[in-house]
Amino acid sequence: MPVLQRISLTLVLAAILGGCSSLPEGIDHPAEPYTSYGPSTLSVLADEYQPQASEQATTAVRLQESGWDALAQRLALVESAEHTIDIQYYIWNSDESGRYLASRLLAAADRGVKVRVMLDDINLNEREGLLSALDAHQNVEIRIFNPTPTRRGFSKWLSFLGDFSRLNRRMHNKSFTVDGTLSVVGGRNIGDEYFDLSDEINFRDRDVLVMGSVVTTIQTSFIEYWDSRWSYPVDMLGDDEQPDLSKIDDITVPQYKNYPELPLDRETADSLLKEVLNEMTWVNARFAYDRPVPVDSDNTDEPKATAVLLGQLASESKQEILLESAYLVFDDGQLEEWQTLNNEGVEIKALTNSMASNDLVTNHSAYAGRRYDMLEHGIDLFELKPDSKLCQASTQDVSKCAPETAYGLHAKSVVFDRSIASIGSFNFNLRSTYLNTESVLIIENKAIAEMLAKTIEQAMSEDNSWRLELEDGDVYWYSGDQNWDSEPETGKWERMQSGFLQLLPIEKYL
């Protein structure tokens, strides 16, 4: 069969599958009755840490740099929960940390806590059975964002093609809010590799524990997604089998070397939270997020709200912008804006993954195709080394770092003029700019911004990253006295793959 004929047949099948889908195009959710809750242990605890007197500093923050911090504080919040837990993630892995956290959510539900979990569909990987088992609990409700109508095998991807403009838009937001009082937002998903627990790859990542006025906006964002027409109850997606609670048996507690035990009960949770709250900084902050459903899903040329906000903050910078992004891709218009800033004297430094530290060659290819242009437009580039010293500093466990375990960058942060910091789910690439929904916490505080700037600069040092330069029209990688004219610590096959992918018109989708 000729190639064009095969392509035509595929598209016809996709259209048929899309038209015969078993899911409605959207859900009209009934309005839920408002429930007023009294004070909780967390709200009483938070009240004890209110600022002395400030009309602007109404939000308290503490950065979560290590995987232990990120998992321990989430678990402490769950153990202390009394009324509600609202969770929104792009990925929730069915691994040690993912299963254990799920088991503690069930324990919270057993004591009467209302648990709501919102997950994107693209990475469910046929785990509807497990999620339906959790959803069967009377106090647990799980919804899936923007699911494919066909759930299994090759036909799933055909249905994806049949409704590409809608299904290509993914929910990348991340939040974890308990009793409407404390929340965790940032770059991490739920899974071993985000908590320094994986034996395959671990990520440098960053979240923020927040309390105060901005939590109301985070909660509003969650409800907007929860009630959106692209939000589907998980029991609509699976088969009609009885939910099997044995799917969440055999739960083990994750173990860290050289860190305290994770909080396993209310007493240790309260103790940890008191310690953490005492270390929080009161700041002026705002939480920005994209709307869940675009007015026109076919329009992929308009930047999302989070992209516009970050672009505005960049344009207002006078001295320096420090970027840290797992994926880094700018289009021609954005590059011209960076060039204008550079011409005005703004120093722009960006840290991203090297090919050797990136777990996705496809994503790296989009960056590699724009790398020369970025350097030419005044952006100083740094690429993370896979054996970065940052890993051991975070994990305190050499077995979780290279060469035994791969190490990559997943953080998404930026510092403007060492006075404003942004931490969130937004990668500085075209998918975050035009397609995904994202969320960011903007912190206006010089102490926090300076601390984050120093953390990013440390990651850019020669112990941790390669520095890139243009010489005679070619890109070179530098580390101390050494230099390379091709991507360090990579093979020809990887570079060939990347080069081939750069020829395809898929830059916006990576």
Predicted regions and their residues:
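Bacterial N-terminal signal peptides that target proteins for export
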Residues: 1-9
